Swiss-Prot record:
Signal peptide: 1-23
Annotated gene: CA11
Function: Does not have a catalytic activity.
Name of the molecule in the record: Carbonic anhydrase-related protein 11
Alphabetic keyword roster: Glycoprotein, Secreted, Signal
Length: 331
């Protein structure tokens, strides 16, 4: 898919040098899990983003793909599509439960098999099932999201990863096929106002919960979560065709970027930055900075359900609300 990436001579020498050094340090790494956001962990070389597509043939799209993510969204390039329907969320009327997990790269929430959570509408032609929620954040406020809007980053980004359950049986199969994945992305700002925090994220980031996943592989079970509370009361969205922003960088993703940011408190953000990407037996390294650098948008189309020529207009009406379980007027 796309052929082998070609290296300049100096870059090739650097790559083979670090790979040779890595081969002499400890046991051989698992090739399917040998990647990081930083090139050096615990004194060992681990491939960072510039090397993802070079160290594993199955990840070649990370280096040579033409529809990679994340991207910088310039609002002047967004094409207004008045025919985009509203987003719909289905939970079967049940509360969400699942496991909050420190993967060593992200804060991850893995929903339990039941209830099944689906998203549809917007640019999606099929119903997509929620597989995972990821939280990415930076070491400093205003720089932690993967995507940017008009060259501006946000303190964090929440990504809801879904697979097309109508065409594929699981996330792995969907990641290899057309119309396979849908990722809803919500941006997060840090508020200096006490208590000004998104209610869903507050359930994940309160002190009693977040301290249960301080180290890599720590996990904590949560229940009675209302996923619809993650979304703003009204919002627009921007969509484009892209890729997974982690290896194997499969170009099967419909991205949907919610254009109204959420808030969390400075204390909640501080708690996130205290999470370690290592187990407790190893030196502390903050989980922050867990995003891929921006990729070229090139000639891909950006579509939105709000007219960028009139950004001052408020999002009003049912098209700018999340429709929960098919309710005609949103939540």
């Amino acid at each position: 898919m796309g052929g082998a990436a070609r290296l300049s001579a100096p870059r090739a020498l650097v790559l083979w040098a670090v790979l040779g050094a890595a081969a002499h340090i400890g046991p051989a790494p698992d090739p399917e899990d040998w990647w990081s956001y930083k090139d050096n962990l615990q004194g060992n070389f681990v491939p960072g983003p510039p090397f993802w597509g070079l160290v594993n043939a199955a990840w070649s799209l990370c280096a040579v793909g033409k529809r990679q993510s994340p991207v910088d969204v310039e609002l002047k390039r967004v094409l207004y599509d008045p025919f985009l329907p509203p987003l719909r969320l289905s939970t079967g009327g049940e509360k969400l439960r699942g496991t909050l997990y420190n993967t060593g790269r992200h804060v991850s929430f893995l929903p339990a098999p039941r209830p099944v959570v689906n998203v549809s509408g917007g640019p999606l032609l099929y119903s997509h099932r929620l597989s995972e929620l990821l939280l990415l954040f930076g070491a400093h406020d205003g720089a932690g999201s993967e995507h940017q809007i008009n060259h501006q980053g946000f303190s964090a980004e929440v990504q809801l990863i879904h697979f097309n359950q109508e065409l594929y049986g699981n996330l792995s199969a969907a990641s290899r096929g057309p119309n396979g994945l849908a990722i809803l992305s919500l941006f997060v700002n840090v508020s200096q106002v006490a208590g000004n925090s998104n209610p869903f994220l507050s359930r994940l980031l309160n002190r009693d919960t977040i301290t249960r996943i301080s180290y890599k592989n720590d996990a904590y079970f949560l229940q009675d979560l209302s996923l619809e509370l993650l979304f703003p009361e009204s919002f627009g969205f921007i969509t484009y065709q892209g890729s997974l922003s982690t290896p194997p960088c499969s170009e099967t993703v419909t991205w949907i970027l919610i254009d109204r940011a959420l808030n969390i408190t400075s204390l909640q953000m501080h708690s996130l930055r205290l999470l370690s990407q290592n187990p407790p037996s190893q030196i502390f390294q903050s989980l922050s900075g867990n995003g891929r650098p921006l990729q070229p948008l090139a000639h891909r189309a950006l579509r939105g359900n709000r007219d960028p020529r009139h950004p001052e207009r408020r999002c009003r009406g049912p098209n700018y609300r999340l429709h929960v379980d098919g309710a005609p007027h949103g939540r």
